[in-house]
Amino acid sequence: MSMLCYTLIIAFLIGIWAAPKSEDNVPLGSPATSDLSDTSCAQTHEGLKTSRNTDQRHPAPKKAEDQELGSAANIIVNPKLFQKRRFQSPRALFSTQPPPLSRDEQSVEFLDNEDALNRNIRAKRENHPVHNRGEHSVCDSISVWVTNKTKATDIKGNMVTVMVDVNLNNEVYKQYFFETKCRNPNPNLLQSECRGIDSRLWNSYCTRTQTFVKALTMEGNQASWRFIRIDTACVCVIIRKTDNL
């Protein structure tokens, strides 16, 4: 009788030890084409190791530039990594399809609550335009989706490798960045003067400004989220001429 009890206890302990843990049964969230899930995760480690998706059946010689670019592409990413994504920006996007461009193919309009409330006002202005005045920006700019960013400067000032393509649940997602740059009307000049500035008193030029967005980067064989710099605006810099002081 005692042997039977011992046998049942041992079988029960073996069954508990062999049961799958809850961490192994975490459901894999399927991201949408416009963006990926931003669910917070209880785990606090910074990055998950990833494996490179290489095709050994048809090896081909690669140049040094191709090897450097390959470190930021064709990466299989664990979906749990996107559960820790925070501080999302509309200027950083993961998608399987190119983001939509505006009608002039130069800018994208992001509507917030204030813009939605002012749509009727803008429509009235378009229906009743004022012909005796011109509305121009101080500096000309162009906004585009950047699809091939492989290098960037992080928040610590270090150069990091940005992942171009990621393989998530057997589907390839591309990392897009919406950047605004200065558009120089005169290609012969490195910097253009600002519009509407009195050149008799001021020296002026247009320059880009940058901000930080959260991006998926690679460091060795580890993928993690980092803040990187991207161009977000074109502003005017004015300097008073010294001979007028």
Swiss-Prot record:
As annotated in Swiss-Prot or TrEMBL, what is the tissue specificity of this protein?
Expressed by the venom gland.
Keywords of this entry: Cleavage on pair of basic residues, Disulfide bond, Glycoprotein, Growth factor, Lipid-binding, Metalloenzyme inhibitor, Metalloprotease inhibitor, Protease inhibitor, Secreted, Signal, Toxin
Answer yes or no on keyword Nucleotidyltransferase.
no
A molecular function (GO) held by this record is: toxin activity
Annotated disulfide bonds = C139-C206, C182-C234, C194-C236
Q: Name one GO biological process term.
A: nerve development
Entry's localization field: Secreted
Superkingdom is Eukaryota
**What's a GO cellular component annotated to this UniProt protein?**
axon
Signal peptide stretch: 1-18
Q: Region Disordered: which residues?
A: 47-69
What would be one Pfam family of this protein? NGF
Q: Which residues form the propeptide?
A: 19-125
Q: Which residues are glycosylated?
A: N148
Q: Where is the composition biased (Basic and acidic residues)?
A: 47-66
InterPro entries for the chain: Cystine-knot_cytokine, Nerve_growth_factor-like, Nerve_growth_factor-rel, Nerve_growth_factor_bsu, Nerve_growth_factor_CS, Venom_nerve_growth_factor
Q: What does this protein do?
A: Nerve growth factor is important for the development and maintenance of the sympathetic and sensory nervous systems. It stimulates division and differentiation of sympathetic and embryonic sensory neurons as well as basal forebrain cholinergic neurons in the brain. Its relevance in the snake venom is not clear. However, it has been shown to inhibit metalloproteinase-dependent proteolysis of platelet glycoprotein Ib alpha, suggesting a metalloproteinase inhibition to prevent metalloprotease autodigestion and/or protection against prey proteases.
Q: Which family does it belong to?
A: Belongs to the NGF-beta family.
Q: How does it assemble?
A: Homodimer; non-covalently linked.
Official protein name in the record:
Venom nerve growth factor 2
Q: Which organism is it from?
A: Hoplocephalus stephensii (Stephens's banded snake)
